[in-house]
A protein has these predicted regions:
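Short alpha-helical segments in extracytoplasmic peptidoglycan/chitin-binding modules
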Residues: 115, 120-138, 150, 218, ...
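Short glycine/threonine/proline-enriched tight-turn/helix- or strand-capping micro-motif at secondary-structure
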Residues: 356-359, 363, 374-414, 445
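Acidic, glycine-rich catalytic/binding loops that coordinate metals and/or anionic ligands
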Residues: 362-364, 405, 412, 455-461, ...
């Protein structure tokens, strides 16, 4: 941790001491708690942990020992590459698994943690290595829902050594949020005049300029284009300069794998790592990063999802000895990011929290016509790509044929909205109708056939026709519709604090992606790609 950061944190703790003592006093009088536990005088010596951000800001846990920082010299690190193999193991996010750390023989004072936007009690418990019932608080908080930012939680201090605790980027700089709507990607590239300004790449739908490639990855994965452009510059110097070697030409993000050659595949790999970090932290299922040599680092519990996304990505690209410097060194990524775009925390103030605590899902119906029988073929799984946010569900129409055929059945609008984007297999419905899928609720449909597909600019009512199920777009072995939700650019987990509910059927995640069920009034439909009798679901009698 940088010397200036530590000083800032000490100042912040002193400035909040009075506030902390007042809050604890109110708590002792009110005896309101998440867990009705006894509070001793010992608890009043707790360690405060305040989320903070911005240049020179961060969150710290003084008892945790930060890893030694080795800052790169000379404008970056030479040959910062990760070598991948075609059969590398994938991270498969699941539900939070509570594995509390052992109680210390001599307990340390508890931590006073102030919640951040997007926090839930189960996720916070996993990050701190405790059970949810061990966390106490001076006022009631939701047991599974989103918690207001700034709420005090008193948590047993069991973590010993963790990684760097400095907040790197706000969440809105990771996802394709409203803060990126005014970003001129093409203009920025052309004004910089580097290698990217003349770069072109051939994709499945023809030749694309560099800004088209970056935007395609950004909008498909809902990852901020500012971030992707900065990563290309930091790793390969493509924005303002030229690649320095052949590896930077073919593998600009540093993942050397012959199957991931070229800008599009490199970016696609990178956004998957960002999504694993971001949504794994959000969902309370990621607590550490692992480096290529097998060493592991426990993530500091006070981090935000955006910072974890970066820590996870760079752990896949750099050895541990260089990782700290890449994250927060004077020649590190964040310094470059601020140089390119200014203070990201100032932009975040206008758009965060991305998921307000009072947010509710609008009424949604099943994505097919009344009277038709479909199958629930996929429980919560990745919204886009092989890994990431488990925000999507799959439904397949009845068919006498297996495999990939365009169905005569229709997928329908789960809610009223404006069609703002179509592509191969893709339809995106903007529910607030402002024309941007990065604001408010948006619904992604995947595997919609091009034939008879609804057009961009069409306003549809709930239940209107969207298109025919098929295998178009993405990877599919059978005809179906893949559907996922976003809010303010963030994928909304299907079985999270804002569960996916269609005609009253609530999604429940299984142990692995694609597993899970739909539940309603005591009825349970388990997902299965087999399309068996038990998976059948219809909209007869209002979705029963």
């Amino acid at each position: 941790m940088k010397r200036g950061i530590a000083c800032f944190l000490k100042t912040r703790f002193r400035g909040n001491r009075l506030q902390t003592m007042l809050v604890l006093g109110v708590w002792l009088l009110s005896i309101l708690a998440c867990s009705q536990g006894y509070v001793s005088d010992y608890d009043l010596t707790a360690t405060a942990l305040f989320p903070a951000g911005g240049s020179g800001g961060g969150a710290a846990e003084p008892e945790a020992t930060a890893l030694p920082s080795l800052q790169p010299a000379g404008g970056g690190l030479d040959n910062p590459v990760a070598v991948g193999t075609p059969g590398e193991a994938r991270f498969t996010p699941s539900q939070p698994i509570f594995t509390p750390l052992p109680t210390r023989s001599t307990p340390l004072p508890p931590i006073l943690y102030y919640t951040q936007a997007g926090d839930t009690l189960p996720a916070v418990a996993v990050r701190f290595g405790v059970l949810p019932e061990e966390i106490t608080c001076p006022e009631a908080v939701p047991q599974t829902g989103l918690i207001n930012a700034g709420k005090l939680l008193i948590i047993p201090n069991r973590l010993e050594q963790t990684g760097p605790a400095e907040l790197l980027l706000p969440d809105s700089e990771i996802v394709f949020s409203p803060s990126a709507l005014d970003f001129d990607l093409k203009g920025t590239i052309q004004q910089a005049g580097g290698y990217l300004s003349t770069y072109r790449e051939y994709l499945a739908d023809g030749w694309k300029s560099s800004d088209e490639v970056i935007y395609k990855v950004a909008v498909e994965n809902s990852i901020n284009p500012r971030l992707l452009l900065a990563l290309v510059e930091y790793q390969a110097h493509w924005v303002y300069g030229q690649p320095r070697n052949l590896a930077e030409v073919d593998y600009p993000l540093g993942m050397i794998n012959f199957e991931k050659k070229g800008l599009y595949k490199q970016l696609s790999w990178a956004v998957q790592q960002l999504s694993i970090g971001y949504y794994g932290w959000r969902n309370g299922i990621l607590t550490e990063v692992q480096f290529s040599d097998g060493s592991r680092v426990r993530l500091a519990p006070g981090l935000n999802a955006g910072s974890v996304a970066l820590q996870y990505l760079f752990s896949r690209l750099y050895p541990q000895i260089l990782w700290n410097g890449v994250l927060g060194g004077e020649e590190g990524f964040i310094k470059l990011y601020e140089k390119m775009y200014g203070n990201p925390w100032m932009r975040a103030q206008a758009v965060e929290p991305l998921l307000p605590v009072n947010l509710t899902q609008p009424e949604l119906i099943l994505p097919f016509l009344p009277g038709r029988v479909w199958s629930f073929t996929g429980g919560p799984h990745s919204a886009w790509g092989p890994d990431g946010a488990r925000a999507a569900l799959d439904f397949a129409p009845a068919s006498v044929e297996t495999g990939c055929e365009i169905s005569d059945d229709w997928a329908t609008a789960v809610a009223a909205g404006l069609v703002v984007r179509t592509d191969t297999g893709v339809v995106v419905l903007d529910l607030d109708g402002d024309g941007y899928e990065q604001t408010g609720w948006a619904i992604l449909y995947l595997h919609v056939a091009s034939k008879n597909r609804v057009s961009v600019g069409t306003w549809v009512q709930q239940g209107d026709l969207i298109g025919h199920p098929s295998c178009e777009g993405g990877t599919s072995t059978g005809t179906h519709i893949h559907i996922a939700r976003k809010y303010n650019g963030e994928w909304v987990l299907a079985d999270g604090p804002l569960p996916f509910v269609l005609d009253g059927w609530r999604a429940v995640a299984g142990k692995n992606p694609y597993e899970g069920s739909l539940v309603k009034d005591g009825q349970v439909i388990n997902a299965c790609t087999c399309g068996s009798f038990e998976t059948r679901i219809s909209r007869l009698n209002g979705g029963n």
